[in-house]
């Protein structure tokens, strides 16, 4: 995934700008979203960086064709689905390793569930690299993983995507109960 001057890269949770700086050198434009106003103001030092100060979940994302982010883990799931509601070519995203394993899980594996189905319905997804917690200067409590996400046409047609997502949520939330009950309780 090489960047060039034609790329507009979205970065969510830009923080102090370590990644932003690297992206700004290679991409035509970087859109950096950062919730902390102090950190956000320090991102203005690059000519080709548009800074959006605020909560990524409350912002409309401007047009971008790539997203490269060290996502805040607390919003991994909602931000991923918000991203997948936009048109873009490719994402390189850092997640908690456990979350990443669920994203890429195959049917029948213990990590397979609603997240796997919902993400894989909208994108090809693969873990590129595991990042051990000790690789960070202030180590988090968990290992991380770098995931490549490539949106594509859905592999099968669902007439009502909202219902489909509710349905798989119901099915997986009550995995141990009989599926029939789960469906009756949640689909009505």
Tell me the role of every PLM-derived stretch.
Residues 1-166:
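Catalytic cores of RNA-modifying enzymes
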Residues 176:
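Arg/Lys-rich, often Gly-containing low-complexity segments of ribosomal proteins
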Residues 185-188:
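Short, intrinsically disordered, charge-balanced linker/junction segments flanking boundaries
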